[in-house]
Amino acid sequence: MALDGSSGGGSNVETLLIVAIVVVIMAIMLYYFWWMPRQQQKKCSKAEECTCTNGSCSLKTS
């Protein structure tokens, strides 16, 4: 991808594409690292079924 603007209007589309990709990656990371642990925390009812690391608890996978 050439970002020097030599392709005329194409560089604008490339910039928008890069921004869109970054936003999607951030949304996925937010989902996995914030939303998923919160959902698992709710399901974790019994202490023996839970595993806690760094203050975030979730159901044991095994």
Curated annotation (Swiss-Prot):
Protein name (database record): Inner membrane protein p12
Post-translational modification: Not glycosylated.
Induction: Expressed in the late phase of the viral replicative cycle.
Subunit details: Homomultimer; disulfide-linked.
Organism: African swine fever virus (isolate Pig/Kenya/KEN-50/1950) (ASFV)
Compartments (UniProt record): Virion membrane
Signal peptide as annotated in the record: none
Superkingdom in the source lineage: Viruses
Keyword RNA-binding appears in the UniProt entry: no
Keywords, comma-separated and alphabetical: Disulfide bond, Late protein, Membrane, Transmembrane, Transmembrane helix, Viral envelope protein, Virion
Similarity comment: Belongs to the asfivirus inner membrane protein p12 family.
Membrane-related topology note: Single-pass membrane protein
Main location: virion
Transmembrane parts of this sequence: 16-36
GO cellular component, as recorded: membrane; viral envelope; virion membrane
